[in-house]
Design a protein with these regions (language model features):
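Single conserved hydrophobic/aromatic residue that forms the stacking wall/gate
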Residues: 1-10
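A short helix->loop->beta-strand "cap" motif at the edges of active sites that frequently abuts
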Residues: 11-13, 41-42
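Conserved PLP phosphate-binding loop immediately N-terminal to the Schiff-base lysine helix
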Residues: 12-35
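Short, conserved catalytic or adaptor-binding loops enriched in Gly and charged residues
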Residues: 35-39, 125-126
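PLP-dependent enzyme catalytic core of the Aspartate aminotransferase-like
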Residues: 40, 153-156, 160-172, 177-208
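PLP-dependent aminotransferase class I/II
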Residues: 43-127, 133-139
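Residue-level recognition of strand-loop junctions within catalytic nucleotide-signaling folds
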Residues: 67-68, 100, 146-148, 189-191
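Conserved PLP-binding catalytic core of the aspartate aminotransferase-like
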Residues: 114-115, 119, 128-167, 184, ...
Length: 208
């Protein structure tokens, strides 16, 4: 692993956000940072939750996994001072229910749906939206469109392009907070028929 030795060189811990770890497309595998090697396990704080996968964010059910006892004790102490993000009875039972066998089966089916959605959107964008750059992801339910070339060619700003989408009912997200100066982020966690409809609307009314 190329990044091994980071803990020794920089004397730092790594806080690894793994909340999207369940969303892995067909044919791919996600490696949690702490599972890569023993060194990474000892310097990492793994943050995760069933909230994204099972839509449980309203119940407050995030948690962390810390193998290093020194780091774990420090985090536990700080957490106890604020009582921030403490679980409640509903969130505890929701978490337990989500991690039963039925939850695993449901997640497997969900990943198949997301894979189909992403593959369709990726192929459609590459075929119909000339000048829009997009990469096929290996997981999550987000797709990032780089519209730099398209906006330059058509003489409009990314803000104007975003408004075009919203005006025809395709609600997408500004990509600038995600280090994409002329980007748009699309959420593909929806029925396949709506992905088809969104792509068709964009072709007819936005990327023209």
């Amino acid at each position: 692993v190329r990044s091994r030795g980071l803990g020794d060189v920089y004397k730092r811990q790594v806080c690894s956000d793994e909340i999207h770890e369940d969303f892995v497309y067909t044919g791919f595998r996600h490696n949690v940072f702490a599972d890569i090697c023993e060194e990474f396990r000892n310097i990492s704080i793994t943050c995760t939750s069933p909230a994204k996968t099972f839509n449980l964010a309203g119940l407050v059910g995030s948690y962390h996994i810390i193998y290093n006892p020194v780091i774990r004790d420090r985090v536990k102490k700080e957490s106890s001072l604020s009582h921030y993000n403490e679980m409640n009875v509903l969130s505890m039972y929701a978490l337990i229910g989500a991690y039963q066998q039925e939850g695993y089966e449901w997640t497997d089916e969900l990943c198949k749906v997301l894979t189909k959605n992403a593959e369709y959107a990726y192929d459609y964008i590459r075929s119909h939206f000339k000048g829009v750059q997009v990469a096929m992801p290996q997981g999550t339910y987000m797709l990032l469109l780089d519209c730099t070339e398209w906006c330059r060619k058509h003489g409009i700003t990314i803000d104007e392009l975003q408004k075009r989408g919203a005006s025809i009912g395709v609600i997408w997200q500004d990509g600038r907070p995600f280090h994409s100066p002329c980007g748009i982020r699309m959420n593909l966690a929806l029925p396949f028929s709506l992905v088809e409809e969104a792509m068709e609307r964009l072709r007819k009314y936005v990327f023209v």
